[in-house]
Amino acid sequence: MYSGAADAESAATLIHDVWNNCIVEKKDSTTDPYTRTKNGSGWFYDDFNDALSNLFNDHIFQQQIGWIKDNQTSVAKYMKNLKNPPDEYKEAFDALKDLYEVYCTITDCAVNPTGSLNSFTSTFNTADSDFIKYYKAFSVYK
């Protein structure tokens, strides 16, 4: 779960940066290939959706998103198998469920970004900080 969230954090950060940099026309060597014409050396796209499409059509980024989706599937399968824990593990299970809920939010930000740039950023930032908080809380039970 942790590695999937870390990969999602990296992907969602790039999504944010491409989205933002296209809107504000900020030059950045990491985002320019997606936000500017002529493979990053031309004009900025008028529509940020073109920049996001470029990112999501990038072969390397597609691989990263594919891995995150595979991780989501694996983690969901494990969580499904953890039903009805013994009483002695109830607190740990509750902490894990909280962590899983935030994990789903942060990975969804990477796999299926929605809303406006502001709402996406808010959702992502909250999920990112909550994941660390819930991960630390769950770590007590390791």
Describe these PLM feature segments:
Residues 1-57, 88-142:
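C-terminal amphipathic alpha-helix
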Residues 54-70:
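Mid-length scaffold segments of soluble, non-membrane domains
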Residues 65-87:
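Amphipathic, heptad-repeat alpha-helical segments
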